[in-house]
């Protein structure tokens, strides 16, 4: 493991830079280009959802296995694999000529984020055991900056070069290759992010037994449920709040952008600050406080049409969302031994993807009822309340596998 403070700082800086370019690249590949590109290929309307969701499937399928393998073979090899996918996938879009080949490329591209994020977080958690909340939060804020810049940069390139998509995906590729070069130069040096924790006689059965320990740990299950609910709600708000602001409130697109953007900015700025606080006071209080605040803020959206209040609610929700996320990842790796740090992060990432995938789908069904936006946002508040109950009950029953 990286030893000196100087090397630790260098590693952390490189991981943030790697995360920025990697997520910038992957987000540019879909926002705002994916829908017009898919439409230009003659994709039927009923298949657009398949193309859009193809990249989320790997997150559900392989985050846990990939992160578990990083526990066994070390983080370096797994991170290099993810960086290679980030670099190679963008250029495959240049050969796409049908909706199904686009879906396949999206599926392949999804492996990059599914592998990279949990393994990177596991590496940071190991290297900064007393500053996990702060460091993981800063890393995630760096990736969030890349995610926030992508639509603007991608939109500008698309505006200048439309109707051609060649230049756009070349730009996506440049960002991906930059991430790969950063990873290759740094990770190729003779420094090990994490030694393999399993003995030489490792077998698949031992990895599966580790997974069994995770799902038997009440604390892990409680935190994972909270994470799933947080992204279920976030995915739903991200999609349906725009509709509420335009259809019900009657705001123009620019005003909508200010409200949605302020939520993201609040998330980016506040998350590291709350992460530092959680390192000092513990994880439980920020998680519960953040969920309670989210419950009231989300539930209040359909009761106002005033721009200043909607802006305040959006900023408040961004802060409360950041408050919860700043503590979930650090807490989950503190409940497991060193052999399962990666696996615990992978399990958390899997639950996150499940929540973010199901959120818009189930919320869409609720929205289709006569209650529409009122029923939708109320259902999100109820689910947040349920997550508090589950978390508090699991907090009482949890046991630390380190003591077993």
Regions found by a protein language model. Give the residues of each.
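Residue-level signature of mid-helix packing/kink "hotspots" within the transmembrane helices
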Residues: 56-64, 147-148, 264-272, 356-357
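Structural signature of the two symmetry-related core transmembrane helices
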Residues: 77-91, 285-300
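Cytoplasmic helix-loop-helix junction between adjacent transmembrane helices
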Residues: 105-144, 331
């Amino acid at each position: 493991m990286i030893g000196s403070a100087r090397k630790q700082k260098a590693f952390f800086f490189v991981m943030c830079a790697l995360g920025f370019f990697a997520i910038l690249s992957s987000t540019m590949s879909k926002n705002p280009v994916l829908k017009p590109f898919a439409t230009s290929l003659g994709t039927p309307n009923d298949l657009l959802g398949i193309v859009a969701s193809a990249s989320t499937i790997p997150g559900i399928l392989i985050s846990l296995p990939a992160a578990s393998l990083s526990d066994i073979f070390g983080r370096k090899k797994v991170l290099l694999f993810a960086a290679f996918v980030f670099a190679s996938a963008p250029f495959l879009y240049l050969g796409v000529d049908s909706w199904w080949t686009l879906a396949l490329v999206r599926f392949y591209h999804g492996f990059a984020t599914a592998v990279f994020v949990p393994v990177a977080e596991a590496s940071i958690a190991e290297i900064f055991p007393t500053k996990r909340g702060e460091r993981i939060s800063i890393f995630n804020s760096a990736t969030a900056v890349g995610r926030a810049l992508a639509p603007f940069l991608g939109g500008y390139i698309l505006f200048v070069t439309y109707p051609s998509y060649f230049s756009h995906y070349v730009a996506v590729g440049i960002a991906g290759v930059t991430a790969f070069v950063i990873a290759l130069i740094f990770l190729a040096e003779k420094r090990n992010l994490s030694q393999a924790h399993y003995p030489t006689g490792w077998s698949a059965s031992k990895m599966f037994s580790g997974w069994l320990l995770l799902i038997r740990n009440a604390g892990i299950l409680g935190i994972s449920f909270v994470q799933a609910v947080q992204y279920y709600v976030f995915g739903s708000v991200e999609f349906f709040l725009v509709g509420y602001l335009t259809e019900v409130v009657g705001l123009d697109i620019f005003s909508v952008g200010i409200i949605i953007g302020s939520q993201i900015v609040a998330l980016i700025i506040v998350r590291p600050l709350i992460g530092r606080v959680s390192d000092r006071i513990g994880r439980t209080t920020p998680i519960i406080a953040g969920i309670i605040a989210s419950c009231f803020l989300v539930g209040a959206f359909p009761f106002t049409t005033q721009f200043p209040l909607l802006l305040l609610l959006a900023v408040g929700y961004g802060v409360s969302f950041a408050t919860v996320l700043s503590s979930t990842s650090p807490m989950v790796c503190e409940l497991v031994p060193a052999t399962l740090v990666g696996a615990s992060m992978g399990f958390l990432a899997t639950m996150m993807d499940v929540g973010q995938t199901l959120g818009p789908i189930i919320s869409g069904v609720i929205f289709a009822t006569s209650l529409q936006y009122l029923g939708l946002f109320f259902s999100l508040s109820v689910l947040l309340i349920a997550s508090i109950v589950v978390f508090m009950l699991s907090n009482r029953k949890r046991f630390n596998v380190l003591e077993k």
